[in-house]
Design a protein with these regions (language model features):
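Cytoplasmic-side transmembrane-helix entry/capping segments in multi-pass membrane proteins
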Residues: 66-77, 97-101, 121-130, 160-167, ...
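Membrane-interface helix termini and inter-helical loops of multi-pass transporters
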Residues: 85-94, 180-192, 239-241
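Small-residue-rich hydrophobic segments that form or flank transmembrane alpha-helices
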Residues: 4-72, 129-134, 142-201, 205, ...
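A helix-boundary/kink motif common to multi-pass secondary transporters
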Residues: 22, 38, 92-96, 157, ...
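Small-residue-rich segments of transmembrane alpha-helices in multi-pass membrane proteins
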Residues: 31-32, 36-40, 75-83, 107, ...
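Interfacial loop-to-transmembrane junctions
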Residues: 205-228
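Transmembrane helix exit motif
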Residues: 54-62, 85, 93, 99-124, ...
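Residues within membrane-spanning alpha-helices of integral membrane proteins
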Residues: 4, 47, 100-104, 108, ...
Length: 241
């Protein structure tokens, strides 16, 4: 019972964080889920919780979703996520952790360099990013920070970024959950645990909306940089252990 209470509290905080900066809940919750339920159950539990969290973020920012960007990203990304989930056990996770960690760290100065040059990507480039990130989403637990440079380079920010990223991630995670179900990795107990964790993330997402509405664009960008710094360092740390 104590472990469930702790998971729910961390989930509420993680929901608030991801509701403000668009991602990060998986990174915050993973150690807690592994400790409470074991590593085998942690990934499918987080996948179900992520579906619920993204539903809440889409509902909170429904009117600001960029549906063209969503379609360009999610249509190639969803089948790629299913393919990634099927190859989860084939690729060495340590190599992936190192590569993603270095990428996140490099994108902190990289995003600022691109912003100074007013770099923008088009819909077809966003579709390529969706396919690549979708595949990685199927392979590893969290690739949320990867979508940050993709959607911001397309020109989205604040509510439009949060809602469109959430809608796109929702499509990818549904594909991943369906694949887990087909592979027999989602017994009823795991589904229930995922829904309990997801409920706390949903509450946090709605709480965070007020903070975003009062936030300046500069502070929002600083928070994104902070997330990528923490994400990159945590992945490199995991790879070294």
């Amino acid at each position: 019972m104590t472990s469930y209470i702790f998971v729910l509290l961390v989930g509420l905080v993680a929901g608030c964080v991801s509701g403000v900066i668009g991602t990060g809940s998986s990174i915050m919750l993973l150690p807690v889920l592994v400790f409470s339920f074991g590593p085998k159950q942690a990934v499918p539990i987080m996948a179900i919780a992520a579906v619920m969290a993204n539903v809440a973020r889409v509902a909170a920012w429904w009117r600001e979703v960029d549906w063209r960007a969503f379609a360009a990203y999610a249509l190639p990304g969803a089948p790629a996520a299913a393919l990634g989930a099927r190859t989860l056990l084939v690729l060495p996770p340590r190599v992936i952790d190192v590569a993603l960690g270095l990428f996140f760290l490099s994108m902190i100065p990289g995003r600022r360099w691109l912003a100074r040059r007013n770099f923008r990507i088009r819909l077809w480039q966003l579709a390529i990013a969706g396919a690549a990130i979708g595949f990685l989403t199927g392979v590893v637990l969290s690739t949320g920070p990867l979508s940050v440079p993709a959607f911001t380079a397309y020109g989205l920010s604040m509510g439009a970024f949060l809602s469109t990223e959430a809608a796109s991630s929702l499509a990818l995670y549904i594909s991943k959950v369906v694949t887990f179900r087909e592979l027999g990795a989602l017994p009823p107990s795991t589904i229930l645990q995922g829904m309990i964790v997801g409920a706390s993330l949903m509450v946090g997402a709605f709480v965070a909306k007020r903070a975003v509405l009062r936030m300046s664009r500069a502070l929002f960008q600083h928070l994104l940089d902070g997330l990528m710094l923490c994400s990159g360092l945590s992945l490199l740390w995991a790879a070294l252990e």
